[in-house]
Structures are given as C-alpha cells and as structure tokens.
Amino acid sequence: MSEKLTAKEYAEKLLYTPEYAADKQADVKEKAAAFAEGYKKFMDSAKTEREAAVVSEQMLLAAGYKAFEPKKVYAPGEKVYFIQENKAVVAATIGQKPYEEGFRLVIAHIDCPRLDLRPNPLYESDHMSYFRTHYYGGVRKYQWATIPLAIHGVFTRADGSSVNFAIGEDENDPVFCITDLLPHLGAEQNERKLSEGIKGEELNVLIGSDTVEEEDVKEAVKLNTLILLNQKYGITERDFTRAEIEVVPAAKARDVGFDRSMIGAYGHDDRVDAYPALLAEIETKDPVHTTICVLTDKEEIGSDGVTGMQSMYVFHFMQLLCHAAGQDDILAFRNSVCLSADVTAAYDPSWASAFEKQNGTYAGRGIAIFKYTGSRGKSSASDANAELVGDITRMLDANNVAWQIGEMGRLDLGGGGTIAKYVANRGIKVLDLGVPVLSMHSPFEVIHKTDLYMAYRTFSVFCQSAD
C-alpha cells in the first residue's frame, strides 16, 4: 500500500510551476551577460538581411567553412556553406551518420520589418527633399515617425557595377526622419484610428533642404541631394530604379534596465534566434547527424521569393548532398528534424488584456516552445506531434536548458505564423521555438539576456544530439 501524501507533497509532485531561468541557475546571469556582448555587436553591424549575410559569411570563413561544391562527396566533420542571392545563409557540418538517417536543421530568419524605398523615391516639396517609402512586413506605421533613421542599401549602376552604402550609423553621419504633426494642430489627426495615425503615403523620409547655388534650376533641393549622392557614390536618379534601399532605425543595441538584464534593439525579430543558431552551428564538432543552419529571408512577408523558405534552395542543398553521396533524399527528409527558430510575443503586464496569462510566454523564463502557431483556429499552423515535443523537451531537460511552452496572445485577437509549415510540407518533422520579445515589430524591441543565452544552449545541444 502506497504511503499517503499530504496536499503540499502532492502539489510538489504533480503541479507544474514555470520558473525564471536566472533565478533557478546561479551562473546563468553571468554567462548570459557575456554572451550578449557578442550579440549586440552583431546587431549593430547587421541592420539588413544583406548585411547579416555578409557578417555571417565572415564568421563562417573565420571558422574554417568552405564554399559548397554540389558534386563533392564530403567527409564527416567537414564544414560547408553557401549564400543564396546575397540575402540568405546556409551552413552545415557533415555528420558521422549517413544523410539517409536524417539532418538536424535550425532555421531562423534575418529579414526584419522596415521601410523600403519605392522604385522612384526621390521628390521635392516646398523646398525640402524626401524619399517615398513602402513599408515591409507588419509595421505599426505610427512608430516610425520622429525617430532617427539610417539608410542602408545597394545601387546597381548603369555599367553593371554595384555600390553598397549605409548612412546614419556612424556618430558623425547625418540621420533622417519622418515628421509628424505638433499636438497644437493635431485635432483632425487625433480623430483617426490608431492604425491610420500615420498612413502609408505619409511615411516620407526627410533627407534635405539645401539648394544648388545656380538660379533658375527646377527642383533645386532635389538636384542638390542628387549631386551629393553622385559625388559620393557615382549614382544618378535612374539608378534608384535598380536599387534595394532600406530605411531602418539608427539606434544601436543597448542594455535595458538598471540591472542591465535586457537588450533593446531594432531587429531582434529574428536575429535574436539567428545569431545563436549560427554560433551553435559554427561551434559544432563531429556531430552524429549532419547539421544545417539556415538564416533565411522574406519571412516577414510570407517567405515568398527566391530567398524565402517557400523557395527550394535549402531542400536542393540537402538533395545535392544526398545525390553526391549516392543516398536517398526522400529517406533523408523523412528522418530529419528541424527547429523553426522564430520569436514570439513576451507577456507584457502593461498590455495584459492582449494575452492569456496561463499560456503566455515570459521574458526571462528561457526559450519558448510552441507546439503550434497560426491564428484563431490554428489557421496556417504546423502542429508538431506530441512525440516530437517530448523528444525536444527531454533533450533540454537532460542538458539543464530552461524552456517554457505556450501560445501567442488571446485566441481571437490575432496570431502569427512561421516557416515551419514550409519545412513540414517536405516531410520533415519540425517544432517552433524562439525568444520572447517585448514590443515586437517595433523600431526598438526588447529581449531578456537569459532567453538569448538559452536559445544558444538549445541550438547547441540540438546540433550535438544523437537522436
């Protein structure tokens, strides 16, 4: 006959109470703080997906990765990579087991909500010059007014050459901004819905006000702006039609809070998962299964296009590895496991009504796992099997990695999607997880250093796992 337990003993045995990782593990704060320093440097040097790809390639080359050769048979331990159209990164470490026994993938994205310049962006109005923009991804437009902005991009010139540039990041650079009305004249604007407080057609970036010295020149301010750009970059107005230019916040990544426990920056979504995923891949040595880290593009607008996960570039890479080695790619896909690493909304006490507290995910409790994403009735979700959730959480528990599980917000309020379904459509088992973010999709998002570090730990143990 079993011993009868007290109610308190039953509670300790049966109930599940999530804990804050830094409270549970004494050394976590110190390790997380140290890890965060490298992350902040990455964030400041990778404001766009192109820049993130460049910085990632530099890290990979420094770690000994070689450019992928499609028909080569690779040996265990070799490290290869390729860059997809300058905007996405694929890096792999060849494992001890045949490809047919499965790959281990970690996929994050390096595009972020932003403002793109239109094909014909430059105009003058009342002695001021502006760029017209087209917002990219799910931005709350009013958040982009009256903040310092930087302009990053690439021009493809008439002779076929390209020039990359970034203005507004160096402390000696000028910055740019989108103006707003003063409250004294804002009565009509105040009657607008919040979503229309600043409209898309009003997201015009102020870039100049000086004129050329000669008289009788039309659009003298616009011309003066073009002369300055031509003198520095050798471009003409027509070159804007074959350019990719992004407007991003000019702010650097900064510690947040008296205790410095958090980081505020533009682009945590999803570079807070991309950076630790890449670092975990770089540090992987002689894995059992071949590991693949993907830093993809276009997630914020549906993963379409040649650099998005609805393209085949990642899956072609896997197939090419298999075919060169004379192995079956279908078996390889069926035996593979993927972590879809994307951020989620951290429970925000200031906006508690938007969340269901019991199933929220919290800053500081570790990496957040999502069995499913989607919106309302799980629309567009990849719903992971319970067995896969069990496999991953047991792996994390065995390695003392702090994790939590939940959903994003109230059921009927909205939702969100990830790249998971595009991977699952190829017959690959996939689980969503990532770092919780406060003020997600804003120009200054906030994350907890502990969660960043636990993301790194998660990807590291996954890459080295045998099952």
Predicted features and spans:
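N-terminal hydrophobic/helix-forming segments and targeting peptides
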Residues: 1-467
